[in-house]
């Protein structure tokens, strides 16, 4: 998969994940009434992070928001905080990833800058997905605990022969939406981090070459400029060599042992 394709797929997955997180946070069906023991009922109750609703058999639905903050369970407030943090980080990462797309050119932005922005958005998407998954999982754990506690309290008295009427809640649709959305955001963040490696410029290693200056020296004197190139010394040496060398005629003028034969 090319870098551009990986980046675009990660961007689309992150958009879907962020939209799912927003939808799950605003949904009212985080917990729904368990109808296992009473499938036919005139009232159906379900609750969300922000309000609780009651739907009657006639089709009329009445929702009542939570008018208190401090009176809510600590776990519910923690779930709210996790979902909000996940949405904020996902929105910031989405904004950064738009400018980091390789198929979009903004001025003279270098590939190294796009690589850094891609890595930043990928980390934000990963943290956003983890926050969403953690928030939904905490709420699900709270539902499971309350469900079994309510089940135990229903069969009390006379050796468990007397069954009391008590409302139990089970998983709502918002939990599954949140899990899927968090997973999509997490996958998008991982793919963004993978695409960052393709955008990073490759480092080129150059071999060091030693450079030696020429042997010509330049001498500076207060009286003026005089360049000493070394030709004078070479001329003198040449004259000495020429003076010491014998010409061919001079060599032949001296008698040798072969001349007397």
UniProtKB/Swiss-Prot annotation:
Residues 195-261 are annotated as: Required for role in regulation of RANKL-induced osteoclast differentiation. It is found in: Cell junction, Tight junction; Cell membrane. Residues 1-6, 102-122, 196-261 are cytoplasmic. GO terms for cellular component: bicellular tight junction; cell-cell junction; lateral plasma membrane; plasma membrane. The chain crosses the membrane at residues 7-27, 81-101, 123-143, 175-195. Pfam families: PMP22_Claudin. The modification Phosphoserine is found at residue 214. Residues 28-80, 144-174 are extracellular. Signal peptide: none annotated. GO terms for biological process: bicellular tight junction assembly; calcium-independent cell-cell adhesion via plasma membrane cell-adhesion molecules; cell adhesion; cellular response to estrogen stimulus; digestive tract development; epithelial cell proliferation; epithelial fluid transport; lung alveolus development. Disulfide bonds: none annotated. InterPro entries: Claudin, Claudin18, Claudin_CS, PMP22/EMP/MP20/Claudin. GO terms for molecular function: identical protein binding; structural molecule activity. Residues 242-261 are annotated as: Disordered. It is a multi-pass membrane protein. PROSITE patterns: CLAUDIN (PS01346). Its main location: other. Keywords: Cell junction, Cell membrane, Membrane, Phosphoprotein, Tight junction, Transmembrane, Transmembrane helix. Involved in alveolar fluid homeostasis via regulation of alveolar epithelial tight junction composition and therefore ion transport and solute permeability, potentially via downstream regulation of the actin cytoskeleton organization and beta-2-adrenergic signaling. Required for lung alveolarization and maintenance of the paracellular alveolar epithelial barrier. Acts to maintain epithelial progenitor cell proliferation and organ size, via regulation of YAP1 localization away from the nucleus and thereby restriction of YAP1 target gene transcription. Interacts with TJP2/ZO-2. Interacts with TJP1/ZO-1. Interacts with YAP1 (phosphorylated); the interaction sequesters YAP1 away from the nucleus and thereby restricts transcription of YAP1 target genes. Belongs to the claudin family. This is Claudin-18. It comes from Homo sapiens. The lineage of its organism: Eukaryota, Metazoa, Chordata, Craniata, Vertebrata. The gene is CLDN18.
């Amino acid at each position: 998969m090319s870098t551009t394709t990986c980046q675009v797929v990660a961007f689309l997955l992150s958009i879907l994940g962020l939209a799912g997180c927003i939808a799950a946070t605003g949904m009212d069906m985080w917990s729904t009434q368990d109808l296992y023991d009473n499938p036919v009922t005139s009232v159906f109750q379900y609750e969300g992070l922000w309000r609780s609703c009651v739907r009657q058999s006639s089709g009329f639905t009445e929702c009542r928001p939570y008018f208190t903050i401090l009176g809510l369970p600590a776990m519910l407030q923690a779930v709210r905080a996790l979902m909000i943090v996940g949405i904020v980080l996902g929105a910031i990462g989405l904004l950064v990833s738009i400018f980091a797309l390789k198929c979009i050119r903004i001025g003279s932005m270098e590939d190294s800058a796009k690589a850094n922005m891609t890595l930043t958005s990928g980390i934000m998407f990963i943290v956003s997905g983890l926050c969403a998954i953690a928030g939904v999982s905490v709420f699900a754990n709270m539902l499971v605990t309350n469900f079994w506690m309510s089940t135990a309290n229903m069969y009390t008295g006379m050796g468990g022969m007397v069954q009391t009427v008590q409302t139990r809640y089970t998983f709502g649709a918002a939990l599954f939406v949140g899990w899927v959305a968090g997973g999509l955001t997490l996958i998008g963040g991982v793919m963004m981090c993978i695409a960052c490696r393709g955008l990073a410029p490759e480092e080129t290693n150059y071999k060091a070459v030693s450079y030696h200056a020429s042997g010509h020296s330049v001498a500076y004197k207060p009286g003026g400029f005089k360049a000493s190139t070394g030709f004078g010394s070479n001329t003198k040496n040449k004259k000495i060599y020429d003076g010491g060398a014998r010409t061919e005629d001079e060599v032949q003028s001296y008698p040798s042992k072969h001349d007397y034969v």
